[in-house]
């Protein structure tokens, strides 16, 4: 009877378990779970299509093929449920059990599991301490292994070849036991005592002398400990019986024509069963050992192929020559179980169609074709039809809908009301790629999209398609409306600025109506009110752009009215403005930037609702006025500057001059190339500037007859100036000159295209330009994939960074200051601290008042206070220093950028960070496509000019005065500052080695005065004293080559790498006596030359202090675009060591040079106190410090890029984070992309989660072990409580791939990469996945523990209060990122 009740049971709830454990299965476990042994390789009978008994599809083992019907047909239907048929042995139950019942195959001989054998490092090999090669020999019957040495003194598990085995037999007789194959290995594994081995290994580790031995022992100890703690037995890695997958998961489908399509697994299983049966028979017949061995080996290979085909030897191929898909392949990769079916599923109640623009829609609406709506809302329609009494049964409702009767459309209108749908455009790169709208029924078959949300979807209407999804349950509808409605997503989660901003036509229209025109109709009139302007405009008494004065009410404060100078167009625009927004916001020419600012200001002052209304009105007014303006462009709008020929002529002269210098041998080819490119880059800029000046100014005749220059209404200029379409770069190509083009290799072709598109290109110029443009297209295709992969890795590493508590109570934070480059402020401190939380009280430096109390969010008003107080540094809380154990606290994160207030609990900030960094990556890859391959490259900076006036101050600059009286800088970390009257430092510049300083200390200078100049393309080596040049070890053909230039016929001396390690090319300066000159005590005038240096002096020539004796050419610059950028971002996040990274000093101290060791230079840094540190620097690398220099910790001793791991080790986590944040930001900044720092910090935090154990103390940790920081801290606390010695660890920087793979959750790691490896390791450790991250919960089919899925939102109690006029309490907004 209870069976009947079970029938109506709900399926198992995915929520009633809290964790998942994975471990190695024992043979007993496999048999216990199995429903019977599969003995025959047969599948189904080809005539009756019924499964063969004991075969791979046997109904007795796996259950009936038809619901409640046994195989022979004796028992049919529900009434016999649960009976086992006595004839065919089949149980009468539903056929879906064929999806879950396992069978098994008993193997005639044990077989090794290939994952534990071949998945590196080999676990079986590690445990037994045998190399993989030897292990394979034993398993594949080519060698013997000692299973029990007894008292012969042989080592346990020693591997013998056939000959050695015969010898040992002769020597010891039968006093030892050895065997081959998996059975022997199983014996060995079974006889191992893990506790004894673990103790032995610990002793070995303490006694180990070499690092390599210690590491090897530690690895082995790890495996032993894993087995000990997990309760897995080592012999289970050898299989005695293998499970057989349920038949429905490896189906056999009859095709028409009597053939069958089958899963590859059936072939693989069949192979195993055949070989196993044959082996059983041979063993019964007592066949010769050779035959049996061969059959055993074949069985091992068959099982290997079943588990992981192709892992060992050649993959077994099916009849069509393609390798069969094994069980591992079913899990792995993009089309494996994890990524194809568990993380991304296809859903019903969805549709897709082409999109068209819907300019008359409101922001929260989208147009849904009637056909689609009818299909999507079917169940709701049926329900309504029945409710209204139009039909009585579902069947008749179905018929009615199919006939599309008029009532159906009425019902559809009703159903659709207030029921939001979700629109999604692939690729969904950030959360704004799916937004919710209220559907509006439309005719036609295309979905209509509101123009303002195109930016977020990155959609255009050239044939893009979008998908519609329908949220069904009430909860999902509420979430969709509250969190995903387009009207609730006005701000971008990446940078907190509005993303719903008018673009293109709308911008142009608003720009046109807010421009002012000199001497227009009605110029200078004065109006009494806004309405009066409107009347005058409608009566055509005043021009839209006339400059007039109007008396306006001050709506913001209700003060007395103001008279403002403005234009009728701006007054019209004011009509749609909310009262809270001041008129000054729009009383200017409204470009796209200004519009974005307007939406932002409106959001802050007037709130969400008003902003949405404003956005819609801006859309309408923008379209309206761009139509009225009727702006169009003609070829005459592309005005070519008159000075163009002169500029090009001048540039050509300069290029000739440089060519001559090169011919005379004054400069190298590299310098010549760089200088030529610089000249052309500058000329192109110059022409562009003149052209833009021309376009933006018109000359008109004023009423008094004078000619006046006024801003022009040139259409092309208006489009670019307003930001609606086109850029200065594109206009430059239309009317200036195209400029330099790039080769596909990224080098710049030195002959520029001097023509523009209006003049037309010659054949050669056209050819050069197609060269670069094609590269752009090819790149785009390739880079999109790379960028997608970067996003995937970022999401994976950050998916479990969730806001878990309000305040972690940390006392630590970051100090933030304005970001400057070359003395120029790139990002003001205000932009960097907005929306962050203050760490301590922020005080006014003058009055000492508290500007911002500690733990308070710094909002826009506070930022203004801080900036006006002139604070240069502010301490804020940061994700990096957050002490939350799991996740991040709200105070350390600060403002939720997309909502404009402090972040809510449960927000998935990690995923948002990953999307914010990944999304522009994909966008930027598309960027090259539009410029068309013109080389974009900044001319290098060669000099410094003062930006402010003041007095000069030298900071840490050593200089000598050369023969021309210039100060030449002789050290690297010098800085030059300009101090104003009050003694405040106005600007500060780092001065490079070898620069000429044009000013002297304490001199008063004016703005724009030259301070210093240098050659950006070479790095000079200068002499500090005068004297006579002598070469040392500069031997032609050994350490130096005379390179003859083919063009000029001149030779120059270049230092090359020598085979002789003792040869050290150097230039020595001798004094009059012929001795090496002393610079100062202990420092000689000896200069070592790195590989690649060009020697610029002759032997025995006389040099003065500050003269260049050799030059090291810098790289020729390539175009800087995001291609350089994306791999750079990936390199930073993967924490790769750069190719030639610089050795950095770990301490502060003074540099001296020691004796060379092993052909490397020895640099010694001596601190004021404590031990000196020695560094070896490879020969041929240029050492950038000099004897007697004072270096700071973290400073590079040689040329090269920084290695993030060194920065972490020497300067600590904060400096590393600062370095990573700044480097990543620089790449994006070059492209003009804004990303908030906190996103990059979130990713860096995830990269720094782990520590590496240096000393174990009294803890149970192992040396060199890598583990999560808080596990380490817990273990230390435990030991300290008992009075033991704690372990010592160093922070560890993991790249994002490594960090994702080393997460606690094995499910998440397995679904990311290296599935087999992750699962193998996890099963040996008996890992428990406590389902804390997002991915593992998605895979298990549960709600994610973020946003509304947080436990604290699940168990809310709703209490209805007595409504005695009490207003309900506001509910905290629930956010699900």
From Swiss-Prot:
Keywords: DNA-directed RNA polymerase, Magnesium, Metal-binding, Nucleotidyltransferase, Transcription, Transferase, Zinc
Sequence positions that bind Zn(2+) 1: 70, 72, 85, 88
Positions that bind Zn(2+) 2: 808, 882, 889, 892
Binding positions for Mg(2+) per the UniProt entry: 460, 462, 464
Molecular-function annotations in GO: DNA binding; DNA-directed RNA polymerase activity; magnesium ion binding; zinc ion binding
Main function: DNA-dependent RNA polymerase catalyzes the transcription of DNA into RNA using the four ribonucleoside triphosphates as substrates.
Protein name, as recorded: DNA-directed RNA polymerase subunit beta'
Organism of origin: Geotalea uraniireducens (strain Rf4)
Lineage, broadest ranks: Bacteria, Pseudomonadati, Thermodesulfobacteriota, Desulfuromonadia, Geobacterales
């Amino acid at each position: 009877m209870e069976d009947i009740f079970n029938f109506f049971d709900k399926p198992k709830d995915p929520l009633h378990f809290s964790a998942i454990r994975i471990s190695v299965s024992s043979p007993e476990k496999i048999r216990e779970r199995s429903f019977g042994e599969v003995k025959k390789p047969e599948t189904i009978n080809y005539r009756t299509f019924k499964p063969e008994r004991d075969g791979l599809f046997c109904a007795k083992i796996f259950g009936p093929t038809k619901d409640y019907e046994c195989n022979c047909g004796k028992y049919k239907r529900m009434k016999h449920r649960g009976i086992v048929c006595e004839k065919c042995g089949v149980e009468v139950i539903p056929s879906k059990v064929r999806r879950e019942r396992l069978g098994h195959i008993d193997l005639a001989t044990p077989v090794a599991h290939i994952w534990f054998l071949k998945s590196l490092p080999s676990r079986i090999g590690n445990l037994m301490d045998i190399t993989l090669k030897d292990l394979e020999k034993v398993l594949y019957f080519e060698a013997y292994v000692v299973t029990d040495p007894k008292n012969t003194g042989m080592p346990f598990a020693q591997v013998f070849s056939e000959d050695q085995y015969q010898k040992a037999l002769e020597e010891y007789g039968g006093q030892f036991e050895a065997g081959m194959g998996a059975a022997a290995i199983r014996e060995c594994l079974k006889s191992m005592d893990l506790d004894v081995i673990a103790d032995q290994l610990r002793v070995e580790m303490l006694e180990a002398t070499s690092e390599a031995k210690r590491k090897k022992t530690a690895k082995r100890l790890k495996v032993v400990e894993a087995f000990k703690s997990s309760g897995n037995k080592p012999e289970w890695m050898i299989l005695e019986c293998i499970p057989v997958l349920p038949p429905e998961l490896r189906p056999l489908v009859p095709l028409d024509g009597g053939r069958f399509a089958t899963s590859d697994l059936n072939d693989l299983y069949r192979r195993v069963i055949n070989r196993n049966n044959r082996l059983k028979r041979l063993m019964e017949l007592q066949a010769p050992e050779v035959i049996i061995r061969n059959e055993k080996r074949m069985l091992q290979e068959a099982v290997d192929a079943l588990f992981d085909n192709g892992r060992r030897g050649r993959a077994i191929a099916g009849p069509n020559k393609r390798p069969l898909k094994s069980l591992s392949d079913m899990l792995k990769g993009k089309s494996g179980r994890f990524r194809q079916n568990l993380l991304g599923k296809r859903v019903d109640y969805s549709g897709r169609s082409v999109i068209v623009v819907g300019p008359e829609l409101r922001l929260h609406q989208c147009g849904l074709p009637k056909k689609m709506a009818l299909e999507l809302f079917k169940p709701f329609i049926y329900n309504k039809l029945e409710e209204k009494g139009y039909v009585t049964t579902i069947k008749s409702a179905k018929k009615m809908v199919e006939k599309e009767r008029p009532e159906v459309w009425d019902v559809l209108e009703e159903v659709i009301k207030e029921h939001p749908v979700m629109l999604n455009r692939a690729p969904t790169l950030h959360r704004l790629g799916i937004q919710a709208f209220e559907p509006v029924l439309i005719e036609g078959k295309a979905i209509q999209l509101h123009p303002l949300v195109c930016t977020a979807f990155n959609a255009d209407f050239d044939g893009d398609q979008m998908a519609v999804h329908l949220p069904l349950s009430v909860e999902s509808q509420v979430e969709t409306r509250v969190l995903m409605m387009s009207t609730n997503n006005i701000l971008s989660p990446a940078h907190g600025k509005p993303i719903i901003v008018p673009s293109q036509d709308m911008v142009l229209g608003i720009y046109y109506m807010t421009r002012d025109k000199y001497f227009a109709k009605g110029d200078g009139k004065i109006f009494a009110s806004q309405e009066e302007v409107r009347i005058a405009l409608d009566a055509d008494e005043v021009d839209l752009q006339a400059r007039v004065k109007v008396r306006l009410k001050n709506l913001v404060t209700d003060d007395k009215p103001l008279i403002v100078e403005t234009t009728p167009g701006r007054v019209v625009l004011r009509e749609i403005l909310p009262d809270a927004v001041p008129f000054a916001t729009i009383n200017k020419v409204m470009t796209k930037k200004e519009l974005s600012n307007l939406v932002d200001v409106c959001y802050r002052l007037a709130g969400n609702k008003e902003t949405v209304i404003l956005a819609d009105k801006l859309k309408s007014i923008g379209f309206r006025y761009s139509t009225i303006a009727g702006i169009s462009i003609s070829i005459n709008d592309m005005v070519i500057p008159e000075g163009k020929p002169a500029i090009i002529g001048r540039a050509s002269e300069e290029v000739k001059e440089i060519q001559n210098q090169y011919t005379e041998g004054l400069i190298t080819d590299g310098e010549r190339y760089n200088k030529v490119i610089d000249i052309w880059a500058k000329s192109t800029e110059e022409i562009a500037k003149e052209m833009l000046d021309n376009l933006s100014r018109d000359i008109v005749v004023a009423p008094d007859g004078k000619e006046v220059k006024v801003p022009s209404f040139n259409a092309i200029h208006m489009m670019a100036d307003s930001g609606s379409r086109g850029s200065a770069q594109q206009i430059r190509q239309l009317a200036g000159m195209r400029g330099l083009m790039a080769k596909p290799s990224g080098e710049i072709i030195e002959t520029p295209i001097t023509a523009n598109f209006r003049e037309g290109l010659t054949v050669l110029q056209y050819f050069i330009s197609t060269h670069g443009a094609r590269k752009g297209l090819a790149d785009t295709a390739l880079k999109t994939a790379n960028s997608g992969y970067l996003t995937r890795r970022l999401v994976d590493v950050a998916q479990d960074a969730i806001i878990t508590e309000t305040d972690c109570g940390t006392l630590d934070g970051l100090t933030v200051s304005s970001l400057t480059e070359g003395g120029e402020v790139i990002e003001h401190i205000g932009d960097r601290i907005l929306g962050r939380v203050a760490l301590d009280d922020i005080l006014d430096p003058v009055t000492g008042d508290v500007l911002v109390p500690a733990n308070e969010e710094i909002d826009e008003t506070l930022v203004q206070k801080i900036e006006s107080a002139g604070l240069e540094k502010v301490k804020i809380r940061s994700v990096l220093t957050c002490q939350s154990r799991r996740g991040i606290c709200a105070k350390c994160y600060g403002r939720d950028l997309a909502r404009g207030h402090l972040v809510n609990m449960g927000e998935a900030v990690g995923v948002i960070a990953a999307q914010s960094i990944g999304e522009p990556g994909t966008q930027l890859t598309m960027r090259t496509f539009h410029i068309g391959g013109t080389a974009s490259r900044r001319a290098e900076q060669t000099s410094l000019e003062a930006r402010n006036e003041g007095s000069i101050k030298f900071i840490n600059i050593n200089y000598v005065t050369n023969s021309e009286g210039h100060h030449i800088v002789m050290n690297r970390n010098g800085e030059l500052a300009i101090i104003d009257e009050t003694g405040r430092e106005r600007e500060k510049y780092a001065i490079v080695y070898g620069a000429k300083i044009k000013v002297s200390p304490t001199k008063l200078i004016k703005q724009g005065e030259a301070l210093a100049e240098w050659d950006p393309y070479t790095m000079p080596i200068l002499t500090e004293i005068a004297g006579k040049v002598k070469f040392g070890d500069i031997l032609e053909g050994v350490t130096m080559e005379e390179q003859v230039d083919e063009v000029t016929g001149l030779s120059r001396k270049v230092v090359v790498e020598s085979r002789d390690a003792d040869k050290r090319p150097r230039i020595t300066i001798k004094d009059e006596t012929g001795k090496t000159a002393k610079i100062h005590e202990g420092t000689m005038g000896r200069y070592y030359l790195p590989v690649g240096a060009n020697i610029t002096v002759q032997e025995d020539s006389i040099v003065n202090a500050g003269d260049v004796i050799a030059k090291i050419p810098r790289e020729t610059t390539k175009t800087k675009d995001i291609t350089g950028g994306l791999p750079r971002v990936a390199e930073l996040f993967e924490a790769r060591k750069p190719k030639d990274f610089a050795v950095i000093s770990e301490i502060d101290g003074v540099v001296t040079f020691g004796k060379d060791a092993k052909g490397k230079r020895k640099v010694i840094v001596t601190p004021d106190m404590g031990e000196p540190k020695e560094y070896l620097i490879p020969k041929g690398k240029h050492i950038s410090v000099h004897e007697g220099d004072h270096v700071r910790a973290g400073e590079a001793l040689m040329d090269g890029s920084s290695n993030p791991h060194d920065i972490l080790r020497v300067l600590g986590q904060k400096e590393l984070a600062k370095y990573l944040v700044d480097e990543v930001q620089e790449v994006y900044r070059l492209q003009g992309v804004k990303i908030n720092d906190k996103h990059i910090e979130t990713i860096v935090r995830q990269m720094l989660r782990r520590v590496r154990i240096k000393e174990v103390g009294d803890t149970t940790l192992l040396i060199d072990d890598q583990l999560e920081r808080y596990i380490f801290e817990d273990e230390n606390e435990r030991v300290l409580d008992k009075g033991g010695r704690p372990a010592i660890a160093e922070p560890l920087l993991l790249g994002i791939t490594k960090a994702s793979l080393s997460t606690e959750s094995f499910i998440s790691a397995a679904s990311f990469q290296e599935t087999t490896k992750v699962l193998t390791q996890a099963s040996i450790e008996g890992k428990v996945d406590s389902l804390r991250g997002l991915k593992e919960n998605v895979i298990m089919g549960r709600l994610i523990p973020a946003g509304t899925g947080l436990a604290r939102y699940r168990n809310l109690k709703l209490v209805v209060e007595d409504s005695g006029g009490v207003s309900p309490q506001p509910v905290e907004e629930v956010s699900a990122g």
